[in-house]
């Protein structure tokens, strides 16, 4: 048969080749920092915000740098070489962002500081998604998950030291390593807690759950890519060795430290038996075991159930889409996880695990003490269907709780409490974004879910057992992680930690890149003027974001200096300097109020006292917080500031307190009928 003679393809000149928004060799290191660093670092005592400011910096600045590069490349090369496309998912996300940006036009924003910070974080995560969808390399997931596993394992080590009160490295006293105690400040100083450097139990549980899911994926889908005809059998052996090591380590606590050496020998044997190049797979198994141990000892029910769902999704996809050998790999790593689960039942925190599990069964209607919080959130939504503004939930909580007591007649289960979060991210977004914002958020999830389900059902990517080609499987991890974090979002607050949101954004990007129809992606920047304008906007936004976070870092540092000095004039100087920086402005104003009140009490100066109270009361009306109630209440009773006293009293649960006029002598010796807040039921006096 005559062959067709086609002309040889012309080689595309280098200057006309298509370019990514950000080069892979630049994007991946930036993403490794943004994804790997925030959960391991904290601000420390040099800053007023001892936790978040450096986490925000580590997560956001790499995205800002990548945005700067993307803007420059768009301006320089144009749409001919740099293809800029936004899928429908990104456009809906952008619509939410724009809607929240415009909300101050019709909503009274109580705290501009919180609104601005939330908007910056929200925009940063959107940028992270767009750049990941367009430029993140498929091969980049392996180092990302490896960095995440290492980070989580170190956090588990930190948590083990914290729970034992050894986070100050006191066990090094009297040894040759005693000088290393000065490095103990790398661990969050929270002895008696099991939270690592995440600073919160559920967030620690979520982070190690994300790492466990990544470890399972690395072992089942990535570590055994070579020699697929045998990888099912080979994957079992190291899992058996690591499982035996877990069992031996469990008994080593009570039997003999000699067994620790046996366990180490088994781990070494696992590495030797599987070959030098497969030491990576053994390391992944060990870190996965450590991270699952941390998850169980965190006693976080939401994170544990979320991981279970994520693993079920991954297992279902594995059985439905891929060859039997993948299921064997998956089963091997699950064997290690089950051994760690068994060992955790004999750990010192096992009683808490059992008690919290039993509580959720006995008191299912209480939903882990969330029933009252959700009732308050529902009342807030009914009171403000247009939304209260992004980042404003916590400043409307006391008002929402007061409205909830009125609407629901304060049943016994509805106790007074205060929290910053709804412990349900979707409910909280309905409160903050209103009906429109909440529906857009749900639409975003639906737009992700439909193409993903369609792609899974159609049987794409299936291969035959013993095939010599390995499909791209990053989407398996992505779909599983979205499931995990979405479940956590129903009971906790992962959306309000940017260090979690960047992981969710990456998962969305990899999933949508695989399943989203091409017809639902839109090319933009076709005209030169739009290209230049957009590129310039990206550059300016990047620089502005870096300036904003730099200002916050310096403001936090200055505010810490103010709180650390006993010199009245120097403290006021530092406070006035810190007030210039937006991120800390509201906190600084509150501290200025306390400064004047303390100075007024020391000098017995009523004018300074009143000035301080007025500042604090103004701040309280913008940002009502439970920490301020008692001190403001005492001052209002002491100086009989009745409007403030009645407003504070209105926030308490009906029937537990009442206002009553009681005869008292004032400073001049006269008898007056002072209005006081008393315990117990009763009607309020006029």
Describe the function of each predicted region.
Residues 345-361, 530-570:
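Hydrophobic alpha-helical transmembrane segments in integral membrane proteins
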Residues 561-686:
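C-terminal luminal/periplasmic domains and tails of membrane-associated envelope-modifying transferases
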Residues 40-54, 75-80, 249-253:
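Short, hydrophobic transmembrane alpha-helix segments
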Residues 167-195, 354-368, 375, 379, ...:
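Interfacial juxtamembrane loops and adjacent helix segments
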Residues 2-21, 458-473, 507-553, 682-684:
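A juxtamembrane structural motif centered on a specific transmembrane helix
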Residues 200, 385, 410-450:
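A conserved mid-to-late transmembrane alpha helix and its immediate loop/hinge
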Residues 2, 18-41, 57-71, 97, ...:
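Alpha-helical transmembrane segments of multi-pass inner-membrane proteins
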Residues 69-83, 101-113:
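Transmembrane alpha-helix boundary signature
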